[in-house]
């Protein structure tokens, strides 16, 4: 998938922004939320908290944060750092490792990578 995106970006003279596992580090997984740090060209070991115990959502959140900074840099949106941190902490992913009762979780894993992350 990455190859296809990079090829299309090159053909259209567009930048590609991504996040790899080396860009973030899980500080603590409490089971119901995760503290992590993000270190890339936009964030310098900034700490965030997401309200899910789904480890794979750390990379998704990191990518969303990076995309927001790209949009900020290009003048598409205005963002304040403290507002971004607060917003991330309030995000809820209904149907993504959502606990609906004691020991009962719902997850709508919708692709092979999501299913792999769910069962591993």
Model feature map: region roles:
Residues 39-120:
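Nucleotide phosphate-binding/pyrophosphate-handling subdomain across enzymes
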Residues 2-46:
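Extended acidic/charged loop-beta regions that coordinate divalent cations
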């Amino acid at each position: 998938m990455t190859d296809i995106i990079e090829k299309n970006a090159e053909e259209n003279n567009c930048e590609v922004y991504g996040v790899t596992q080396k860009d973030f580090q899980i500080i603590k997984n409490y089971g119901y939320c995760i503290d992590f740090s993000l270190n890339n060209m936009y964030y310098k070991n900034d700490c965030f908290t997401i309200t899910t115990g789904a480890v794979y959502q750390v990379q998704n959140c990191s990518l969303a944060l990076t995309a927001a900074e790209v949009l900020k840099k290009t003048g598409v949106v205005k963002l304040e750092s403290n507002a971004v941190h607060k917003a991330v902490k309030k995000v809820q992913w209904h149907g993504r490792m959502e606990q609906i009762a004691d020991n009962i979780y719902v997850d709508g894993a919708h692709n092979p990578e999501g299913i792999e992350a769910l069962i591993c």
